[in-house]
Amino acid sequence: MLFTALIALLPFTMQAAEKQRDFTIGQNTFLLDGKPFVVKAAEVHYPRIPQAYWDHRIKMCKALGMNTLCLYVFWNIHEQAEGQFDFTGNNDVAAFCRLAQKNGMYVIVRPGPYVCAEWEMGGLPWWLLKKKDIRLREQDSYFMERVKIFEEKVAEQLASLTIQNGGPIIMVQVENEYGSYGEDKAYVSEIRDVLKANWYKKNSKGELVGPALFQCDWSSNFTKNGLDDLVWTMNFGTGANIDQQFKRLGELRPDAPKMCSEFWSGWFDKWGARHETRPAKDMVAGIDEMLSKGISFSLYMTHGGTSFGHWAGANSPGFAPDVTSYDYDAPINEWGLATPKFYELRKTMEKYNDGKKMPAVPKAPMGIITVPTFRLTEYVPILFGFDKMEEGKLKTFEEMNMGWGSMMYSCTLPEIPTSSTLSADIHDFGQVFINGQYIGKIDRVKNEKTLTLPAVKKGARLDILVEGMGRINFGRAIKDFKGIVGDLTLTAEYNNAEYTIKPQKWLNTTIPDDYETAVKALRTGSTKNLAKNHNDLTTKPGYYRGYFNLKKVGDTFLNFEKWGKGQVYVNGHAMGRIWSIGPQQTLYVPGCWLKKGQNEVIVLDVVGPRETVVWGQDTPELNKLQLEKSNKHNNIGDKPDLNSMTPAAKGTFKSGNGWQTISFSSAAKGRFLAIECTSLHDGSDVAAIAELYVQGTNGKRLSRETWTTKYADSEEDNGNHTGDKVYDLQESTYWQTVKGSGFPHLLVIDLGSEQTIKALEYLPRAEQGAPGSIKDFKIFVY
């Protein structure tokens, strides 16, 4: 009887086992196994979360009502040296995807090769730059050769995990926001073909099957590179006019499903500016609207985590390196706990959970602990961390085969009887010494390129210590060499003549950024014990080490506000960058990387601390600035006298969202661009501009790489709405004036050199109604 029952069940069992699952594109909807499916995705990044906490973070996303995880695959963390791949431990992306499936989640994979993500060089490996003439994100033969190898390795890890193979992966992205980089359908097509070749396989019927391929971009540029056979998705932020964002897509593809592939829950922080936040109500309202209309989304970020070690990137134009924390003001905070944003969103998500009960919010894997103040008592000078020395011309990090760290550049000088001006393109933070005496710094963040040196005698030694920060991750400037880039010159006037000196004989010394180098330096150097009152030793660049003891482990936030600038290692783990200017003053230290008993802390401080003390807090400090001077651009001496000038154009902007172009009656020539606003469409006095471009006489946009803000009559810096936001390549950020500051409002841009301009392009805020949009204006070029 039992045997007969088993035989009866066998055909059904075999049929079920053979039935292939699928994710396809239907009319106005995605189809999961043939049924309409709305993607509710949580963006999370496996390298930004300790592996021991992966399961907890995935469960947190599920408890928020998400059904999918969206993740980038970071090329440069998997291939840190050319040809050497690592998919183990915290880099085991396949294990992360399997864990997602175990928790009942689907997965969207975004394998680049470029990913942005406020990550070093946008995920591209630094060693690509050893080929100085490489064309990144183009059909450069070497670039594409390495891309194909990388994508093949990724597919070896993940292609067996597609939904057609019984795994969780339903979609794979082709490149990433390419419309913000350029227009090159041939390149994007080749990336698509590479992914198809690795992810698509023939089924039993001989049909090629694989995950749905899609490309994401902004509503303002997605048509530049849109391929006919790919799904098109939009990226935009909270508060955006959602109907407007999908309007053009609906016109071009009226039957296509709609998806916001990056709905920005917050924003990233940069060194020297305040911590970014975004209102919960705008995020919740946007998701509610999308779900009510059947629009799929991925919430970027749902949990941001931490850019440990040297992995934080930088934005451009205007070099703006990102802090270590990637909290992002996301619903799940940096250390994995639910925020008020989380619970507000959870209430809304419950409405769209098919009547099912929401999963419980999981308990944190570890509690939060504090650590009493302790002192780092060992010290060796920074040069004990040297790796290689080469004599000759100036060399970049890449030419010295070093990805991350610092370099010391040294030479001897001829006699210069008067003060001189040192000029160099330093990437990124340079400190200048003569005969061991500190002279000053050149900081790329402040767009500094020169420094005045005192008179020197023949044979004086010039040392320049250059720390490289994260490589630019967005825009054309991602080809970001580190060190002294190009020539260094000294100019001086004496004996009624101007002299230019270009030292040619340099000693290039590399100081890599890694734990092994730090340990070697402390072992081989003549370690000095820093007594409590010997703070004369704590003002020097070097390696510092100390210890703290624990009876119980837990997550904590180590405070480094007394320190200068550099990197921190705890028990061998690279925790990230510190910089006294803030806003981040603490580093998140996961309890899974701590231990009972003695714990080691090493700080590589390239500046030197004010005091060698550290303590552990139970809350982070992400919004404490310690600046030498304000970030505002309101020096009255920089304000131009517009009364004596004739405007290049004047008139009235249209109301509403979207780009507008103002053509000049005749070309205007000048180095400075001023836009004066005398009224707004919404009747308020709070003006805002999201982005500005200028066009040359050929009608094409001119580069903004050299732009800086000269003057702004008013800037709302509490929300980081400073003048530099109008050329930061981000349509969701904006310059905004302070309420009550009064008309006229004025913003002046230094273009970097004299330009001939025929038109100005203006973008108001992306939110519905375009709050703060300018009505009456005058444009000056001088």
Report each predicted region and the residues it spans.
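Aromatic, loop-rich ligand-recognition surfaces of beta-strand-rich domains
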Residues: 575, 638-644, 653-709, 713-782
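Short beta-strand-plus-loop segments that form exposed binding edges in beta-rich domains
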Residues: 464-470, 603-609, 676-683
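Active-site neighborhood of glycoside hydrolase catalytic domains
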Residues: 143-227
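Aromatic-lined ligand-binding clefts that engage carbohydrates, nucleic acids, or primary amines
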Residues: 419-433, 462, 548-571, 578-579, ...
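Aromatic- and acidic-residue-enriched segments that line the glycan-binding/catalytic groove
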Residues: 83-91, 102, 113-138, 188-193, ...
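Aromatic-lined substrate-binding rim segments of carbohydrate-active enzymes
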Residues: 54-120, 192-196
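N-terminal carbohydrate-binding accessory modules
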Residues: 16-68, 98, 553
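Catalytic-core region of carbohydrate-active enzymes that cleave or remodel glycosidic bonds
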Residues: 198, 239-333, 337
